[in-house]
Every structure is written in C-alpha cells, then in structure tokens.
C-alpha cells in the first residue's frame, strides 16, 4: 500500500479504505472561495459492487493499493462476461459486467486495453483514449450554418450519441474520445 494525497486520486485508481478495496469511478477537486479545498470521490467496493461517495481534504492521506496495469487484448463477450487475453503469455481473464460498466460500448474485437489487476483479479479497465467508429445517422445540414462553432447530433455505430461538424455525413468513419464521447477528427483510414 502506498499513501498518496487525496488530490492526486484519479479515475481507475484502487484505494484501500478501512481494509476494503474500492475502484475510483470519479474524482473531483473543489476549491471553494472560503474554506479548505476538498476532493469528492465516487467509488465502487470491489467485493460486492456497492457504490460509495467520500469527501477528503485535498491534503489528507489515502492508501492506494498496489495494482498491476497489464495490456490485454479483447476477445469476445458471452454470458460469463468479457474475455481478454494477455498477448505476452496468452493467459485469459474474464471481466464482469459490473467491472466493465458503460465502457462496453467502445469494445472492439482485438482492441488492446489496460487491465488493472490486484492479486490476480481484474478490478478496472482502461480503454484507449480514442476509438474509430462509423456514423450511422446524422441530421441534414441547415444551409447558412457556419463550420466553426456549430455541431450537429449524430448516432455512432455503437449506439452512442455525439456531436459532429456539419460536413460529416452518415457512413463516415470518425475518431471519438472514449472519456467524454466527443468528436476528435475524421478517421484517416
């Protein structure tokens, strides 16, 4: 276990709070005009999946559990969960639906992800920062819109909605940021 200050806690970190392991879902630092800055952390207890919320002063010490981050390749999904393979030694692990959360929409066969493993158990998954997806539906362009500041809604091939520039049409492959579902650029393939 490593002690770190609360303000350095990030999404995906594994914390040891009162002898129980938690995966950080969100971590935000608040600096009110009056009073001490605090870090608001939403976490999921690994043992039973219960979500909890904690608030610490930013200078408070919290314990981070030792977690190994390993590259794994996504294989497939079945009733058991999501199957990943370590390309270095061909070991396979199954990640549960709860651990995967809403990130499953971005999984593509053969995609390399980083799994956080603690004592042989996959705790959290980190997707690549950007993925390439196809636009399946967009609204038509309204004449007179400027290309600089206006975006139009679009539906991606994985079912997620995003906003794209007016020149992007259905069938176009685009690069999307996995963290906030935002448009990055037109795919270069």
Curated annotation (Swiss-Prot):
InterPro entries in the record: Elong-fact-P_C, NA-bd_OB-fold, Rib_uL2_dom2, Transl_elong_fac_P/YeiP, Transl_elong_KOW-like, Transl_elong_P/YeiP_cen, Transl_elong_P/YeiP_CS, Transl_elongation_fac_P
Record SMART domains: EFP, Elong-fact-P_C
A single BP term in Gene Ontology: peptide biosynthetic process
SUPFAM superfamilies noted in UniProt: Nucleic acid-binding proteins, Translation proteins SH3-like domain
Molecular function via GO: translation elongation factor activity
Keywords: Cytoplasm, Elongation factor, Protein biosynthesis
CDD domains: S1_EF-P_repeat_1, S1_EF-P_repeat_2
Coiled coil: none
GO cellular component: cytoplasm
Subcellular location(s) of the protein: Cytoplasm
Metabolic or biological pathway, per its Swiss-Prot or TrEMBL entry: Protein biosynthesis; polypeptide chain elongation
Stated role: Involved in peptide bond synthesis. Stimulates efficient translation and peptide-bond synthesis on native or reconstituted 70S ribosomes in vitro. Probably functions indirectly by altering the affinity of the ribosome for aminoacyl-tRNA, thus increasing their reactivity as acceptors for peptidyl transferase.
HAMAP family: EF_P (MF_00141)
NCBIfam families, alphabetized: efp, PRK00529.1
Family: Belongs to the elongation factor P family.
Protein name: Elongation factor P
Source organism (scientific name): Rhizobium etli (strain CIAT 652)
Gene: efp
């Amino acid at each position: 276990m490593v002690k770190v200050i609360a303000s350095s806690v990030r999404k995906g970190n594994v914390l040891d709070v009162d002898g129980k392991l938690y995966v950080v879902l969100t971590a935000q630092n608040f600096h009110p005009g009056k009073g001490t800055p605090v870090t608001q952390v939403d976490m999921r207890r690994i043992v039973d999946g219960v979500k909890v919320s904690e608030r610490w002063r930013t200078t408070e010490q919290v314990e981070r559990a030792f977690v190994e981050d390993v590259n794994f390749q996504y294989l497939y999904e079945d009733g058991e969960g999501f199957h990943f393979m370590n390309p270095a030694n061909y070991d396979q692990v199954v990640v549960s639906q709860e651990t995967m959360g809403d990130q499953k929409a971005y999984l593509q066969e053969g995609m390399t992800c980083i799994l956080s493993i603690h004592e042989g158990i996959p705790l959290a998954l980190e997707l690549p920062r950007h993925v390439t997806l196809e636009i399946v539906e967009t609204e038509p362009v309204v004449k007179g819109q400027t290309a600089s500041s206006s975006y139009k809604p679009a539906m991606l091939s994985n079912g997620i909605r995003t906003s794209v520039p007016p020149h992007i049409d259905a069938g176009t492959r685009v690069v999307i940021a996995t963290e906030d579902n935002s448009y990055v650029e037109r795919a270069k393939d």
